[in-house]
Amino acid sequence: TDAACSAIGADPNLVTITIKEVAPDNYMRGRQQRTPASAPEQPEQIVHRYLKAMEARDLEAAAIFLSDMFEVICPGNKRFETLAEFTKWAQPRYRSISKTFLSTDVSFQGLDATVFCHGTLSGVWHDGTDFANIRFVDRFSLTAGLITLQQIWNDMPMAASGP
């Protein structure tokens, strides 16, 4: 509904979207019985699965969501082209970290998608003290269902240095 409303400038209460699924045994194209394709995984699902794998430090699982042209840009314009480089850089900063999502927003341009995640970080510093409620925003660019770019903004440097 939101995409249709933004395209035609209509109030959501005045727009009706209908989708009719075709039973697989009724699906034909080019005079041949075919199996319809399943819907692709949505960009926000890809991003959340990637971040869950990263939180678990399962780099192998996280890597399946990445394009060969992947790049991550961290605060201070630190740039990495592999998860191994990125995690090596991040390792001395904290013992563990997790994200609480307050919102996830998606926009599309053709087959490309941009996903913004925003929320708070919590975890444990290397000295064993807990941290929480540190703001973050991550921006992801996806092409053909793969992450090509992750940009990270957060308040961790301020939280690490104290009030």
Please report, for each region that a protein language model flagged, where it lies by residue:
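Solvent-exposed beta-strand sheet faces enriched in polar/charged residues
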Residues: 18-20, 73, 153
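A short hydrophobic beta-strand element
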Residues: 111-121
